[in-house]
């Protein structure tokens, strides 16, 4: 099962807003760009987009597999994620060797660093 529609960042203007004014957090294989929604009184659900370039892999099969793994990680972390955030996860070259547990650990660290998940 994929990431629920309500938690997906899909529109070009949303991506541009996050890229333009979002704050960046870097990991070894992932980069998180996050932006808090402009209406803090009534925050909507947090939404995420995934970006992966052909530098990571020329093969679409490999890129799609990595995106599915990241979506599964986000879905697992959703109960801990605060409402009212937009984020883009950029998959960097070298992520091909990573497994699900590595992505889970790294993305959780990035979300804690961005205060989207409150650290333990």
From Swiss-Prot:
InterPro entries: Ribosomal_Su5_D2-typ_SF, Ribsml_uS5_D2-typ_fold_subgr, RNase_P, RNase_P_CS. GO terms for biological process: tRNA 5'-leader removal. PROSITE patterns: RIBONUCLEASE_P. Keywords: Endonuclease, Hydrolase, Nuclease, RNA-binding, tRNA processing. GO terms for molecular function: 3'-tRNA processing endoribonuclease activity; ribonuclease P activity; tRNA binding. It catalyses: Endonucleolytic cleavage of RNA, removing 5'-extranucleotides from tRNA precursor. It is an enzyme of class 3 (hydrolase). Its EC number is 3.1.26.5. One of its GO terms (cellular component) is ribonuclease P complex. RNaseP catalyzes the removal of the 5'-leader sequence from pre-tRNA to produce the mature 5'-terminus. It can also cleave other RNA substrates such as 4.5S RNA. The protein component plays an auxiliary but essential role in vivo by binding to the 5'-leader sequence and broadening the substrate specificity of the ribozyme. Consists of a catalytic RNA component (M1 or rnpB) and a protein subunit. Belongs to the RnpA family. This is Ribonuclease P protein component.
